[in-house]
Amino acid sequence: MRSHATGPDPKYFLQSGPFSITNILSRAALEIQDPELHILGIDPFKRVSKKNLLLLGLLYKCKIILTNLVAKWLLLHMVGPTIGGISINYIALPVECFWNALVIRRVVKEARLRLFGFALCNHVADHVLEEGILHGLSESAKIGALRAIGNAVVLARNYHPNMIVLLLRWQHLLHLHKDHQYDDWDLFLEALRTVSTKERWFLLNLFTIAAAFDGRISHIEAVSMKDAYGPDYALYLPRLLKLTADLHAGRINAAAALCKIDFTAG
C-alpha cells in the first residue's frame, strides 16, 4: 500500500493510525512491511535503485529454498539417500526450524527496538517542551529540524517506524505542515552552514538521534555523516555509534541518556 500525506494529523497517526504503538508492534510480530507513506514529501527510497530493492527481496525469499537444496545435496553425496532409514527429504524440517528460530529472534529484537523507539520519541518530545527549547529557534532552524529527520529517513532507506514517529512528533511540535523539501540533503547541509552556531549544534543533536533510531548504520549513512558533522565529526560520531548500539541491544536507559537535544555540541 502506498499513500501520500503532505500534512497528516500526527495525533491520528500515533494514537490509532498506522504508526500507533499497537500497529507498529503487530507488523513486527507478523513480519508485515511498514506502509509506504510519503509524509511531508519525504521519499525513503530516494537514493535506492528500485531494481536493487526487487533483487534483494527475491534473494531473501530464496535463501531458505537454497539452504534446503544445498543440505540435501551434501547429505545425498556424503551419506546416501537415507539416514538411519529416514529419507533425506525430511532434512527440510530441521532446516525450517533453524530459519524459524532465527526469524523469531530477529522479530523479538525488532519489536523491542520499536517499543523503545516509541518511548524515546515521547521522552525527547517531553524534554523539548519542558525546557522550552523551541521558543528561540529561527524559521530556518525549524525547517532544518524536519530536514534533519527527513534526511535520516532517506539515508536509512526504509520506512522504519521509529523515524516516522519521531518525524510526526516534531512536525506537531514545530507546527509545520507544508512541504519544504524535507528530504533534500543539499538544503539540509545549507541550513547547517547558515544557521547560528548554537542552532547548528541543535540540528546535529537531532540528526544524530534520528539517524540512530532504526538501530543500525548503513554504508551510505556512514559516508554522509562526514558531510553533515563537518569539523564536529569526531565529536558526534562516537555518540551516534553508542546510541545505535544501545538501541540495538535494548539498553533503553543508556540510550535515553544519549538522546539529549539542546544548543551545546556533542
Where are these regions (language model features)?
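Small-residue-enriched hydrophobic alpha-helices in membranes
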Residues: 3-266
